[in-house]
Amino acid sequence: MASCNPTRKKSSASSLSMWRTILMALTTLPLSVLSQELVPANSTTSSTAPSITSLSAVESFTSSTDATSSASLSTPSIASVSFTSFPQSSSLLTLSSTLSSELSSSSMQVSSSSTSSSSSEVTSSSSSSSISPSSSSSTIISSSSSLPTFTVASTSSTVASSTLSTSSSLVISTSSSTFTFSSESSSSLISSSISTSVSTSSVYVPSSSTSSPPSSSSELTSSSYSSSSSSSTLFSYSSSFSSSSSSSSSSSSSSSSSSSSSSSYFTLSTSSSSSIYSSSSYPSFSSSSSSNPTSSITSTSASSSITPASEYSNLAKTITSIIEGQTILSNYYTTITYSPTASASSGKNSHHSGLSKKNRNIIIGCVVGIGAPLILILLILIYMFCVQPKKTDFIDSDGKIVTAYRSNIFTKIWYFLLGKKIGETERFSSDSPIGSNNIQNFGDIDPEDILNNDNPYTPKHTNVEGYDDDDDDDANDENLSSNFHNRGIDDQYSPTKSASYSMSNSNSQDYNDADEVMHDENIHRVYDDSEASIDENYYTKPNNGLNITNY
C-alpha cells in the first residue's frame, strides 16, 4: 500500500503537470485564434480615448537601430497591417518605406485596455518608416488587425525641433525612440517595448503659404478595432487635423518650427520584423514658426474602425458615381477618374444647310465663265440660221440691182399658223432685211399698173388718139389710116425692148388677114400727141381689153 501511494502521487502529479502544460499551451496560443472564437468575424468594437503625443528634443544624431523585445509566450504573435483607401477617398496610396522626420530624442508610450484573458509579450523591431503625400481633408478610418480588441489610452512623445520649409524637405533627427504598448485584461497583461534610433531621412512637402502659432492640436473622436482570424491583416485609418493653439506640454531644444501649406497631406508607413503598420492620414494642418522653446501637440483621431481582412473578398465591388459631370469608377483598391464623354449642355450645335461658300463660288465661276459664252453662241446661231432672212439680188428694167429678202422661218411658221399660204420660191419680202408684209408675185401683173406707170413706152388711154370704145370699127380705121404715118423705130428703143414686129404704111398690107394675133381692122395705132415721134408701135385688141406690149 505504501508502494501504491507514491505511484498514485506520481500519477496525480503527472496529471497535474499535464493539465498545467495544457493550460500553458492554451495561454500560448495566438491571440487571434482566441479572438476568433470569442469575437465574431463581423463584429466591431468602438471606443473613444484621447491620444496625447509629446516630443522632447535631445541633440544626439545616431544612425543605428536598436530593437529589444521580450516575450513570455513560446508562440509569437505576428501582426501584418497594410492600408487601402475606401471609395470615399479620392485615390489609392502606395506607401514606400522612407522616413521624413528628424527627431532629436523622442519617447512614445501607448497604453490600451483589452478584454481578452491572456497574457503575452509581443516584441517588434522597427526597420523603416515613411511619409508620402496623399490627398483628402477628412475621411473615415477603417483598419483590421490580428491583435485583440483594445483601446488606445494615451500616447506621449517629445519633439526636439521640426523644420518645414516651402517646397523643401522636412528633416528630423531621432536619437532613440521607445514605443511601449500595454494592454490590460481581466487575467493577463500584454506589453511590448521597442527601442529604435533612426538616422536622418527627408520628406518633400508641397509649398506652403500660411503659418500658424507654434502649437497645434487635433482631436481623435473615436476608434474601433476588431480582431481578424488571419495573421496578416489590413489596417487603414485616416484622421482629420485642425491646427489650433494650446498649452505647451513638451520642451523643444530648437528655437523655431517651420511652416507648411494650409492644405497638405502625408501618409506614414512603418514596417517591422514581426509586424507591419501602415497608416494613411489626410490632415489639413498648418505648422508654426516661433522662437518659443516650448510647444505642445495634442492630437485626437477623428474616428477609426477595423474591419476583418477576410471580408474584403466580398467587398471588392465597383462603385460608379457622377460628380459634376465626371464619371468616377472606384473600388477598394483603385480609383479612376474619367472625363464625361457627353455633355448635357443646353446649347445645340448650329448646322447650316446648302453649299459652302467655297463650292458656291466655284459654281458661280463655272456658270459665268462657261455657261454665258455658250448661251451667246447659241443665240447667234439661232439668229443666223432661223431669224435672218435669205438675201436674193435682182436686176430691174433700168439695169439696177435690187436686193430682196426671203421670209425667215419664223414668218413662215406664223403664216402657217394663221392659215395663209406662201410659196417659198416665189414669195419675197421688200428690200428691208427684216421683211414686211409687202409681198408680191411677179407672175401676176396688173394691167392697170402697166398702163399707169411712168414708163414712156407704155401707152395710155388718154394718149391714144382716135380711140373710143363707142365708135365703130370703121371710124377707128379711118382715123388710124388718116393719122398714121411711119416714122420707123425711134432711137429710144433699146435692143432688148425693140419691137419684134413693127408696122408702117408700106408693110402693113403684107400681113395676112387670117392672122390670129393681129387683124387689120382690130389693130389701132397708138399715137402720142405729147411727144414728137411715135414711141412704140403698140397694138391692142379692143375685144378683150388687154394691152399687149412688145417687150
Curated annotation (Swiss-Prot):
Residues 383-551 are cytoplasmic. It is a single-pass type I membrane protein. One of its GO terms (biological process) is cellular response to glucose starvation. Residues 36-361 are extracellular. Residues 430-441 have a biased composition (Polar residues). Residues 108-143, 206-227, 243-263, 429-513 are annotated as: Disordered. Its main location: membrane. It is found in: Membrane. Pfam families: Mid2. Involved in cell integrity signaling during vegetative growth at elevated temperature. Acts positively on the PKC1-MAPK pathway. Cell membrane sensor of oxidative stress in the cell integrity pathway upstream of PKC1. Required to transmit the oxidative signal to SLT2 and to restore the correct actin organization following oxidative stress. Multicopy suppressor of 1,3-beta-glucan synthase (GS) mutation. Also suppresses RGD1 null mutations. Belongs to the MID2 like cell wall stress sensor family. This is Protein MTL1. It comes from Saccharomyces cerevisiae (strain ATCC 204508 / S288c). The lineage of its organism: Eukaryota, Fungi, Dikarya, Ascomycota, Saccharomycotina. The gene is MTL1.
